[in-house]
Curated annotation (Swiss-Prot):
This is Glutamate racemase. The keyword Manganese does not apply. The active site is at residues 79, 191. InterPro entries: Asp/Glu/hydantoin_racemase, Asp/Glu_race, Asp/Glu_racemase_AS_2, Glu_race. It comes from Chlorobaculum parvum (strain DSM 263 / NCIMB 8327) (Chlorobium vibrioforme subsp. thiosulfatophilum). Belongs to the aspartate/glutamate racemases family. NCBIfam families: glut_race (TIGR00067). It holds the Pfam family Asp_Glu_race. It catalyses: L-glutamate = D-glutamate. Pathway: Cell wall biogenesis; peptidoglycan biosynthesis. Provides the (R)-glutamate required for cell wall biosynthesis. One of its GO terms (molecular function) is glutamate racemase activity.
């Protein structure tokens, strides 16, 4: 358990199973440009969404322990699978460090945005199987109707850089057909990899559907939480994020450039 003193100058730690958390990194950079950011993508063990709960909880503890070595003031769990099945492990491992999970932030935003009261959720097999999104949304309003759909192929498609590809469109059409006749007006991207494929998903879902990106929701939540605890970095300087991966740094570099639209800072290869 951490006992180090929280400082406004300490970094924000973000972790995900792979590149999906870059959607959170990008949103946090936009919302909090003065903050020092630390990112870990567990590219050696992606995807998490097909693993057992025991394995996911083990990975969550190890990922958190890695970030804790850098004494962060806040840890953002940029993985919906971990948020659904192992947020308590992260909180226990982090001790006195602030923790935010993307799942609750996305659920709250969806509950407040829907007008019809019918919400669709797409996510990994583990996230959807946990029923965590349905529970979190209904905690906000138990009258809301939630239709979940597991989309296990989206993560490998995003990891391979198939961002706007015929194969991705074909898979998306099959998955999103689950919402035909459900009359949803809101669709939660319940995995941080999915905003990478947002253009395809949005075009198939149609303009009448409000897309909820949990990355934007969690960035707003992070700003609110740091402000509440007096931990916002007041510096006007901006710094490059410190990036770490557990495998394939060159592939991560290529996908970072493709998605973020900027050159990649140095990437540190770490063993898990």
């Amino acid at each position: 358990m951490s006992q180090h003193k929280l400082s406004s100058c300490s970094p924000i730690g973000i972790f995900d199973s792979g590149i999906g958390g870059l959607t959170v990194l990008k949103a946090v950079q936009a919302a909090l440009p003065s903050e020092r950011l630390l990112y870990f993508g567990d590219t050696a063990r992606v995807p998490y969404g097909t693993k057992s709960q025991v394995t996911i909880r083990k990975y969550a503890r190890e990922d958190t322990e890695l970030l804790m070595k850098h004494q962060p003031k806040l840890i953002i769990v940029a993985c919906n699978t971990v948020s659904a099945l192992a947020l308590d492990v992260v909180e226990q491992t982090a001790g006195d460090i602030l923790v935010i999970g993307v799942l609750k932030a996305g659920a709250e935003l969806a509950a407040h945005r829907t007008k019809s009261g019918r919400i669709g959720v797409i996510g990994t097999q583990a996230t959807i199987g946990s029923n965590a999104y349905s529970c979190a949304i209904r905690e906000e309003n138990d009258a809301l109707e939630v239709t979940p759909k597991a989309c296990p192929l989206f993560v490998p498609l995003a990891e391979e850089g198939f961002i706007d590809h015929p194969a991705t469109r074909l898979v998306a059409e099959e998955y999103l057909s689950a919402f035909t006749g459900k009359e949803i007006d809101t669709l939660v991207l319940g995995c941080t990899h999915y905003p990478i494929l947002r253009k395809v998903i949005e075009s198939i879902a149609g303009p009448q559907i409000t897309i909820i990106d949990s990355a934007e929701a969690v960035a707003s939540k992070a700003k609110e939480l740091l402000s509440k605890h007096g931990l916002l970095n007041q510096s006007s300087a901006t710094t490059l994020p410190h990036l770490m991966v557990s495998d394939l740094p060159q592939k991560f570099r290529e996908l970072y450039r493709l998605f973020m639209g900027t050159e990649l800072p140095d990437v540190e290869l770490v063993g898990m």
